[in-house]
Amino acid sequence: MAANEKTYLSETAKVDQSSVQPFPNSSKIYVEGSRSDIRVPMREISLADTPTDFGGEQNRPVRVYDTSGPYTDPEVQIDLRTGLPDVRSRWINERGDTEALAEKSSLFATQRLNDPALASLRFQHLRTPRRAKSGANVSQMHYARQGIITPEMEYIAIRENMSLQQAREQGVLQEQHAGQAFGAAIPDEITPEFVRSEVARGRAIIPANINHPELEPMIIGRNFLVKINGNIGNSALGSSIEEEVAKLTWGTRWGADTIMDLSTGKNIHETREWIIRNASVPIGTVPIYQALEKVDGIAEDLTWDIFRDTLIEQAEQGVDYFTIHAGVLLRYVPLTAKRVTGIVSRGGSIMAKWCLAHHQENFLYTHFEDICEIMKAYDVSFSLGDGLRPGSIADANDEAQFGELETLGELTKIAWQHDVQTMIEGPGHVPMQMIKENMDKQLRECGEAPFYTLGPLTTDIAPGYDHITSGIGAAMIGWYGCAMLCYVTPKEHLGLPNKDDVKEGIITYKIAAHAADLAKGHPGAQIRDNALSKARFEFRWEDQFNLGLDPDTARAYHDETLPKESAKVAHFCSMCGPKFCSMKITQEVRDYAAEHGTEITPRAPGEAEEVVRMVDVEAEMQKKSDEFRAQGSEIYSKV
């Protein structure tokens, strides 16, 4: 815990200023739905006009999906001590199926609240927790199966459909290659009804706890944009609440669609409260981590009662999805004995140790329906954990991994009987040629429930670069149908990530997710690529920077070679210089063609441009004949 944490939390909590700066040449816009309180945020990037040398035309702004929440809206006053503005309380209250609780249901949460020693750490503006009324189910899946389109579903449809609407407006920029979606059912237009139907059949989830009203609704499913998750959390080795909140705001700025708080150090409860109250994206946790802390790290001392209290504690704080390692069965544990790296999942190893110590079946498995009752009372989504995932490519796709996956498929069907939203976690370390088998088996065993994978890492030889080894696998499995990709930072296997590592991991995974969207043929996915390519050809440097995923780094790299402001309007690039710039030469060819009576006809993407003569060929040939005679009719001449 940082030495100044008492002062920070109780008196002077301030948002990290680097997280609230608007992106260059961008503005926050809101698209309104069928009711005034459905206001969907997007980031609009303004572009310069095409220079007259290139035809001189106006370039429309480009809108991009925005996960940064109110932090990048200059009209919103951010105060971490009071949390983010409420988005969903009115929708939740209108449904009339929840009730405010007079006190917390968790014994542990009550003890923390009544401990005066924690006053300086505690978030001061605690929300009154809500729970489903007796006999009610408040999950988005339950509403969807009743045929109800919730405001959350309409909000998501507007958000996901953004690129398609732009495509209709953008003319030439709407050109897009056909995709290969491997059986996914991506529609031409995403409507609220389509969102409802996907949630109803279990192919998508909307992680949105009723106790997280600050949330801006989003969706995870193979027929929607590929999402990414960023991990934060303290450990026994260090970090403070201040640092974790800063990682949250920093991560969502750069594109994290969800955040998992994996804290295992001190004050887990208080850290999580600060994170949720200041999060506009869904927050996930692994409850077994905190339950283990409650028994001083002794796995065999874990009990169902302790775990149940932990679930309720976190659900009433507003956690949107839980990783539950219910598929680590006693009979699977011996299958890992001959592995190169054994069991590498922290949650998986905890439950394996408990099973062996008691020689009983995993209590998360035997109490699974009890867990479902808790989940549907708060609308917490399952993220069924892959506790037996491979920790090396040598162990990929083995009997232990696939046995657990089959069990997760069985548990998914039970969760769906309770109308509880469910996604499935996946590997891990898998070489490229074995990735598709993972995706195909998951779709088959789990009824197309969303898949959520950690990478996978495609090779084990690059410590310090595992954001790259895993980004390769992430792009591939995203293309094959994975719905959400859990980022990996350069510090994977080496240490706790700092802010810079978080950003690098997120940008790497935004690239992977976007590449997958392009490959699947998601409607409108190519607009941003086309806009940036057009800016590059027209030497609109500022537009190139601003259309990129990381404008700051792009600008900094350009400045290293061409630091002067005049270079930002130069008609050559920093790589080749003025004489060898291929794009400059191409423009000169076009200018020459126009000047000499030829026309270059653009073809479809991937085809060569066609040069059509617009003059009398015989006259031109006669002109060359006259030149030859005038020079003495010599075949060879000295140069």
Swiss-Prot record:
It holds the Pfam family ThiC_Rad_SAM. Zn(2+) binds at residues 429, 493. Keywords: 4Fe-4S, Iron, Iron-sulfur, Lyase, Metal-binding, S-adenosyl-L-methionine, Thiamine biosynthesis, Zinc. [4Fe-4S] cluster binds at residues 573, 576, 581. Its EC number is 4.1.99.17. It comes from the Bacteria. Pathway: Cofactor biosynthesis; thiamine diphosphate biosynthesis. GO terms for biological process: thiamine biosynthetic process; thiamine diphosphate biosynthetic process. Its cofactor is [4Fe-4S] cluster. InterPro entries: ThiC, ThiC-associated_dom, ThiC/Bza_core_dom, ThiC/BzaA/B. It catalyses: 5-amino-1-(5-phospho-beta-D-ribosyl)imidazole + S-adenosyl-L-methionine = 4-amino-2-methyl-5-(phosphooxymethyl)pyrimidine + CO + 5'-deoxyadenosine + formate + L-methionine + 3 H(+). One of its GO terms (molecular function) is 4 iron, 4 sulfur cluster binding. Belongs to the ThiC family. PANTHER family: PHOSPHOMETHYLPYRIMIDINE SYNTHASE, CHLOROPLASTIC (PTHR30557:SF1), THIAMINE BIOSYNTHESIS PROTEIN THIC (PTHR30557). This is Phosphomethylpyrimidine synthase. It comes from Teredinibacter turnerae (strain ATCC 39867 / T7901).
